[in-house]
């Protein structure tokens, strides 16, 4: 059943749904509310959209942070907020200025970066590709003015209601079998052009 991110999270927590899948990452807050099977489903590559004119000097997140660049604000309940928080905890000498905000339109984020109001937009690579670089992308008019660099890949999981321990075990077992058979790697290559799980090993 297709649903929004918020409905999935609230629905699985409340018991409306037993399980949900939507590119979910682990966070300490989520681990208190849900069961995460040990085996991940796949991975999401995350990084930063920046102005093309900055691409020669900003090639990674360290460059971005050390240059004192500003990220488009992130909602605290968004898992990406936790990723930047973790980065800052590990890089106390050059943390990223992390501003909390409520949700906003994606078009605003790209416009703010182009205007210079902010210097980067932290997002999933697949979203950048769909929104900016793909054929007939909704913000394709920005593709010559924006570029993207990867930060890291994060494992994504099925999300299971706290009471559904048996279901979580069955899902975990099934995912383990699919991994051993190479089915997940096969699907990643088909839909993403590469085996995303391999990127996790490089972190």
Residue map of PLM features:
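Hydrophobic residues within well-ordered alpha-helices
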Residues: 12-13, 48, 64, 112-114, ...
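Extracytoplasmic small-molecule ligand-binding "clamshell" domains
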Residues: 1-24
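Periplasmic-binding protein-like
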Residues: 42-47, 79-83, 136-172, 175-192, 194-203
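Extracytoplasmic ligand-binding site segments that recognize negatively charged/polar headgroups
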Residues: 41, 47-49, 72-87, 125
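A ligand-binding cleft/hinge motif common to bilobed small-molecule-binding domains
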Residues: 13, 21-32, 82-86, 114, ...
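Flexible hinge/capping segments at coil-to-helix
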Residues: 51-71
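Ligand-binding cleft/hinge of the Venus flytrap
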Residues: 78-103, 110, 132-138
